[in-house]
Amino acid sequence: MTAVIAPPLIPVGKIKSFGAFGPNYEVGRALRQLDDGDWLVDIKMVETGETAEYRMTHILDDPEAR
């Protein structure tokens, strides 16, 4: 039997920045859990619209955009 693992609460739609001075990004949905227990989350760069995968632990550490 396989266990169903629910993704953590994701702040979908929040605008955050990479560190204090980095570019802004919008948080998307959880994509998949990694072997170390972290989650990959879809993010979208505000200025360019480019999308990427980003670790949930980094999202939680990044500040909200100003």
Model-predicted regions and their roles:
Residues P23-R32:
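Short beta-strand-centered aromatic/proline hotspots
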Residues M45-R66:
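Intrinsically disordered, low-complexity, charged/polar segments
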Residues R29, I43-M45:
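Residue-level recognition of conserved beta-strand positions in structured domain cores
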Residues P11-G19, I43:
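A short beta-strand micro-motif
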Residues F21-N24, T48-E50:
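Short acidic/polar mixed-charge low-complexity motifs
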Residues L34-D36, G49:
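A cross-taxa feature marking solvent-exposed loop/turn segments within ectodomains of secreted
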Residues G37-D42:
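Short aromatic-glycine-enriched beta-strand elements
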Residues M1-K14:
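Mixed-charge, Lys/Arg-rich low-complexity intrinsically disordered regions
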